[in-house]
Amino acid sequence: MNEIVNTNDFSKTDAILGPLIPTNFDYLSTKLQVRKIPKVAPLSTNSVALREAVYQSVTSKKFLRKRMYEYLDKTLNREDNIVLVVDSLNRSVEKELLELFPKATVLRPEKSNYLLPDLVDSLLVDSLPNKVILESQDFSLISSASSQMSAQQSALRSVQLFTTYRSNVYENTNLSLKQLGDLKFTYTTDRLPLKLGEYNSFQNHYISLF
């Protein structure tokens, strides 16, 4: 990277896209030669240092989680049956959620990242609304949890599903959108879903221009 910066003339450069890796991007943004040039950090949800002329094109995971914590704190009744389904890679998130909801029940997935139906059934109740917070970026666990939570719903049993971070894994076409919809799946996002073939004003302007 030093070689690229030191051997190129950036005087006619309008903008720099990347590097893709946040640590490399942060290093580039410290260089005097490109300090005034707009630099865009693409794709990654990991935060970059917001120095002069730095722009992050994707909302950071940390920011989305912070907003979801605030929403959950204001919205969930502490007397509801709050269940945390958290895999081994999200223990820090589990800790923060338990600080918000100390009475919450933690449901541990099996080693192969699935939930035991009998255990799910025993932890959900009929007498209170069941609020399930799912923290995982593993497709197997997400699929297992959404399927089983959906199956638990009945006239007597209410189940709603939340996550503090909806990763791209949720775009997998093998996940049932109907099940997630039935669970009133709630999460933060940095983009507004559009219907197929529908464009917003910025996209229409871009298409007409280019």
Features from the language model and the residues they span:
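Extracytoplasmic ligand/sensor domains, especially the bilobed periplasmic-binding protein
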Residues: 17-86, 91-93, 97, 171
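Periplasmic-binding protein-like
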Residues: 9-21, 40-42, 81-87, 127-145, ...
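Extracellular/periplasmic periplasmic-binding protein-like sensory domains
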Residues: 144-210
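Structural motif
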Residues: 1-7, 65-68, 112-123
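A short acidic, amphipathic alpha-helical/loop segment
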Residues: 3-4, 27-31, 71, 95-100, ...
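Glycine-rich, charge-decorated loop segments at or immediately adjacent to ligand/cofactor-binding or catalytic sites
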Residues: 50-55, 116-120, 168-181
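Short beta-strand elements in bilobed, periplasmic/extracellular small-molecule ligand-binding domains
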Residues: 1-2, 51-54, 83-84, 101-116
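A generic structural motif
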Residues: 42-44, 87, 104-119, 136-137, ...
